[in-house]
């Protein structure tokens, strides 16, 4: 191999670092109007009246929309969400009106002139409140909604939008075999994606009825589908453009502003209208990372072998279901972690609350459940008097075992956790111990965790690729993968260059997405772009090679079986000096007398998920995804015993990548994920008061890590090829975040001598755990 395994610079790197890269808000459009939302100041209330009369007469105002102007309900799995609240609001920050004006300032000024009368309703402020008997219902008519999937199971007259059950083995037998039992209850807060580029969209309706949507999204083809479906438009009349996206982390997989932009444009006779969140709106109004309340019980024999597990996950899906049923499913599918547990029971539920609604977030719920499980693994090790790494090695899932949904484990579909743990021991200098007392009243501790993650795609998720030639023989790669930052399109170019045996600088990648001309790609989520689009790239390349050989065989008067490709040539296997260059073939081969044979050569490739199944609703048996990526992580901290504060010293990840395609790109992804994991683990959270009003709506109150707080980051790799993936490569984009909160929790538990059971782990939380919050010293 000549291209794979090399740290190729991202195709868009120079444009980004020089400021030449264009994002959605950078495009200047003449005669454009601007839309601004008026958002709810209540978390749960009836809308008694809306008076827009004063706002309508404000100079420059073109249109004002309320919930009465759009009767649709939409959603990813359950159609429960209005674009603009109608009759009642269900979370603080929910859009209640949309003002269209000639500039942002006018729209904001007019929005503040709208008068709304609310009638307060009881606020459901946590999933435990939501699941109490006789709890206030957030969606009184839940089972009357339209369901986009028959595999969603809402519970009538409750706040439960979905439940996933895993029943594996005989749990009662497992408890009888368990000599050591540990259990815990955990709480995790909602949080923000905090992408550099806020969500934004622009819509225009052309005179022929064509709808143009320009948006910063991970899911342009879903936007197209929704606009077409819910507004009864022909799909051919909806065109979505997506340029480079300035960070997403799952937060731009949800369709929200695109629908508002379309409604705004429709209200002003199709004129272009732009809507862009402020940072405060991006935090409070758009969807967020899920929160959760969790209970887990683990049983093991005296040797530390896991014998039984019972788990209950209540996912805080917020006011609308959106993707939260899939978040619950993702937890259930991987609930054992990368451990062999033969007797297992898990209930994972997505719950309505009067909080911001949840969407996908890097790791897709796995960081939440890994934190809980890994805390209990450390508690089990402590109770057994066993080294935490050795306990995990003893229970690592291996060939022949089964996943929670009873898929048989192979090296190919999982990887090598033990090798990851052995490498991690060396990186963390584990032999010196995981707790070292320092002379200055501080202590240095190390916490570890393991992770695994599979995807949660539809059973028929697909991806397409189109390859075209330029006259010089270079290739254009066109696919529907959105470049959201991880370098996906560079990875695809490396896969293509490897297959074609040609220089990667001769591969030109189409960065912008146009749903009219870009081949469809399900969504740029789930760390599946390399797997899905990479497979389509290989098939498109095979199509190219077949055509090139066929055309060259005519020109060289030989069999196509006698030919091979490389270095932008088609040549004879037995004599590579006899060849025809790509540039002389791709538009047809011309003889000296002018006769031309062949024609324009282009390659088509497609991929669709195969042999996946839905889960059995009673047992969870089924194959939800093709394979896993697994690994081990560690965090080292220095803890101040007097102040209950700590600083990060080191964070490390060892991951089984299958086949390493671009080392520096992978390292950057994983380091970024570790940084996010430390932020979620140490400080990032949504704070709500007793009335459900969010208190952390800006970067002044929503705390994030500072540059100087970053520790040393270390990344290493294990390579166990996934035989179903392009060149064996596994997805890695999300995995850097997954185990870090758990490793941090284990390090702090050891340092402060407390049982960490909540995220984030702030100094105040540590102090309260140590003192009960009753004393200012201890």
Predicted regions and their residues:
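Flexible, low-hydrophobicity surface segments
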Residues: 1-155, 269
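Glycine-rich loop/linker segments at domain edges
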Residues: 6, 12-15, 150, 154-201, ...
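C-terminal catalytic domains of large/alpha subunits in multi-subunit enzymes
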Residues: 67-68, 232-237, 266-274, 327-447, ...
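Short acidic, glycine/serine/threonine-rich loops at helix termini
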Residues: 74-78, 110-113, 215, 224-226, ...
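Phosphate/diphosphate-binding loops
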Residues: 102, 270-317, 535-564, 568
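Helix-loop-helix junctions that connect adjacent transmembrane helices in secondary transporters/permeases
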Residues: 138-231, 396-474, 695-706, 714-716
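Thiamine diphosphate
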Residues: 244, 248-275, 488-496
């Amino acid at each position: 191999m000549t291209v794979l395994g090399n740290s190729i610079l991202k195709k868009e790197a120079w444009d980004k670092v020089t400021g030449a890269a264009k994002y959605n808000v950078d495009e200047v459009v003449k005669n454009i109007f601007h839309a601004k939302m008026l958002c709810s100041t209540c978390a749960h209330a009836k809308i008694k009246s809306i008076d827009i009369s004063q706002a309508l007469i404000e100079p420059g105002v073109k249109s004002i929309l309320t919930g009465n102007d759009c009767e649709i309900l939409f959603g990813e799995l359950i159609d429960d969400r209005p674009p603009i609240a109608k009759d009642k609001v269900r979370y603080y920050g929910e859009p209640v009106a949309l003002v269209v004006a000639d500039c942002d300032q006018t729209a904001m000024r007019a929005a503040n002139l709208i008068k709304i009368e609310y009638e307060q309703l009881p606020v459901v402020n946590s999933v435990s409140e939501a699941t109490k008997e006789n709890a206030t219902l957030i969606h009184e008519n839940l089972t009357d909604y339209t369901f986009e999937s028959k595999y969603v199971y809402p519970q009538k007259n409750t706040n439960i939008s979905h439940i996933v059950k895993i029943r594996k083995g005989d749990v009662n037998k497992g408890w009888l075999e368990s000599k050591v039992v540990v259990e815990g209850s955990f709480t995790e807060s909602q949080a923000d994606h905090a992408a550099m580029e806020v969500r934004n969209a622009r819509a225009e309706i052309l005179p022929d009825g064509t709808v143009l949507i320009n948006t910063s999204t991970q899911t342009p083809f879903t936007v197209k589908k929704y606009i077409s479906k819910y507004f009864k438009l022909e799909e051919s009349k909806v065109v979505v453009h997506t340029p480079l996206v300035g960070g997403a982390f799952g937060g731009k997989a949800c369709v929200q502003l695109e629908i508002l932009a379309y409604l705004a444009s429709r209200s002003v006779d199709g004129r272009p209208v732009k809507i862009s969140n402020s940072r405060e709106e991006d935090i409070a109004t758009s969807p967020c990372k899920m929160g959760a309340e969790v209970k887990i019980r683990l049983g093991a024999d005296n040797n530390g072998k896991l014998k039984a597990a019972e788990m209950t996950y209540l996912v805080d899906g917020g006011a609308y279901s959106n993707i939260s049923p899939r978040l619950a499913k993702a937890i259930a599918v991987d609930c054992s972690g990368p451990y062999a547990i033969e007797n297992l029971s898990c209930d994972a539920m997505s719950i309505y609350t009067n909080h911001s609604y949840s969407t996908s977030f890097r790791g897709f719920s796995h960081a939440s459940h890994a934190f809980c499980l890994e805390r209990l693994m450390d508690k089990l090790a402590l109770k057994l008097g066993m080294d935490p790494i050795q306990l995990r090695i003893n229970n690592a899932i291996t060939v022949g075992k089964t996943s929670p949904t009873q898929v048989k484990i192979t090296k190919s579909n999982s990887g090598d956790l033990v090798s990851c743990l052995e490498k991690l021991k060396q990186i963390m200098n584990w032999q010196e111990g995981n707790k070292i007392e320092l002379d200055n009243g501080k202590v240095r501790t190390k916490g570890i965790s393991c992770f695994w993650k599979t995807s949660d795609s539809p059973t028929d998720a697909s991806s397409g690729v189109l390859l075209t030639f330029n006259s010089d023989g270079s290739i254009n790669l066109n696919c529907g993968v959105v470049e959201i930052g991880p370098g996906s399109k560079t990875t695809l170019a490396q896969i293509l260059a490897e297959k074609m045996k040609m220089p990667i600088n001769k591969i030109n990648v189409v960065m912008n997405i146009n749903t009219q001309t870009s081949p469809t790609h399900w969504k740029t989520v789930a760390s599946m772009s390399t797997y899905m689009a990479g497979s389509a790239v290989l098939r498109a390349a095979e199509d190219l090679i077949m055509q090139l050989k066929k055309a060259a065989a005519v020109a060289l008067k030989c069999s196509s079986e006698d030919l091979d490709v490389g270095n932008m040539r088609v040549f004879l296997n037995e004599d590579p000096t006899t060849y025809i260059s790509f540039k002389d073939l791709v538009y047809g081969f011309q003889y000296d007398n002018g006769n031309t044979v062949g024609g324009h050569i282009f390659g088509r490739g497609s991929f669709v998920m195969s042999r996946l199944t839905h889960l059995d609703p009673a047992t969870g048996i089924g194959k939800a995804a093709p394979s896993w990526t697994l690994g081990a992580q560690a965090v080292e901290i220095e803890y101040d015993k007097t102040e209950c504060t700590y600083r990060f010293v080191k964070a490390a990840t060892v991951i089984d990548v299958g086949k390493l395609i671009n080392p520096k790109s992978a390292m950057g992804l994983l380091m970024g994920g570790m940084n996010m994991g430390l932020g979620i683990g140490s400080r990032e959270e949504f704070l709500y008061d007793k009335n459900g009003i969010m208190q952390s709506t800006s970067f002044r109150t929503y705390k994030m890590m500072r540059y100087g707080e970053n520790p040393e980051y270390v990344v290493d790799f294990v390579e166990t090829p996934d035989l179903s993936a392009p060149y064996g490569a596994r997805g890695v984009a999300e995995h850097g975040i997954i185990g870090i909160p758990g490793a941090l929790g284990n390090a702090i538990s050891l340092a402060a001598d407390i049982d960490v059971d909540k995220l984030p782990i702030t100094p105040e939380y540590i102090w309260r755990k140590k003192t009960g919050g009753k004393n200012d010293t201890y």
